[in-house]
Regions:
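Core catalytic lobe of class I
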Residues: 1-212
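Short, conserved SAM-binding/catalytic segment
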Residues: 195, 214-225
């Protein structure tokens, strides 16, 4: 909403309140000026490491292309980074298994451990049958918020897709856990947290966005700060 903010202060406070085993999902893209990307996404990821957090994964949100983002010599931009920072080993990692296996129903020998989980294999001795669904990769094809179902849309100018928030919450937390969004915006994270049975705290300085969020979530259950 045009408000300035202090990344380093936000990062420090996120690390301060994060419990051991907790996870930060940091979604960011670079701005382009005078034909050069800012590189701030990588600087921010490395700063989380300097704060003593682990950089568990560098994920990609793959979305429809939206022009060259200020640089007509570059390829169209169709991705944002999703950095996963943790305080120690993550307490929860409910990795989603909804990737369709092209080789579903066939069998393979010698698949074990992580590979078996990746392919959704069922152990039948030395031969394992490949399941219909395997683990997602760290590249998520989720589209844009404008392509979501009508009930998941909002009047915010740049909301994240509902299923992006939902799927990260489902992966890194369990029912009853507390989810914090320091840039709550129109309440997408809050709605996803409520849908999945998580507690939620949202911080937002723009009263217009708070009003939008209040229309999307039940205030008797979730309180926006």
């Amino acid at each position: 909403g045009g408000h300035s903010w202090d990344f380093f202060g936000v990062a420090w406070h996120l690390k301060r309140v994060l419990k051991p085993g907790g996870v930060i999902v940091w979604v960011v893209a670079d701005a382009t000026k005078d034909g050069s990307e800012s590189g701030s996404s990588f600087e921010q990821a490395l700063h989380f490491k300097r704060l003593g957090l682990n950089l568990l994964d560098t994920m990609i949100w793959n979305k429809p292309p939206a022009g060259a983002n200020g640089n007509n010599d570059a390829y169209s931009q169709s991705a944002e980074y999703m950095f996963i920072a943790t305080k120690g080993k993550p307490k929860t990692s409910n990795r989603l298994a909804d990737r369709v296996n092209k080789s579903a129903g066939t069998s393979r020998a010698g698949t074990s451990g992580g590979r078996a989980e990746k392919y959704g294999s069922k152990d039948t001795g030395r031969i394992q049958q490949i399941g219909d669904l395997g683990l997602r990769t760290n590249v998520w094809d989720l589209g844009l918020a404008s392509q979501q179902k009508a009930e998941d849309k909002s009047d915010h100018p740049a909301p994240f897709p509902f299923n992006l928030a939902r799927d990260h919450i489902a992966t890194w937390s369990n029912p009853g856990d507390l989810v914090l969004d320091p840039f709550s915006g129109s309440g997408t994270t809050a709605k996803a947290a409520k849908t999945l049975g998580r507690q939620f705290i949202g911080l937002e300085v723009n009263p217009d966005y708070c009003a939008i969020a209040e229309q999307r979530i039940a205030q008797e259950v979730l309180e926006l700060v």
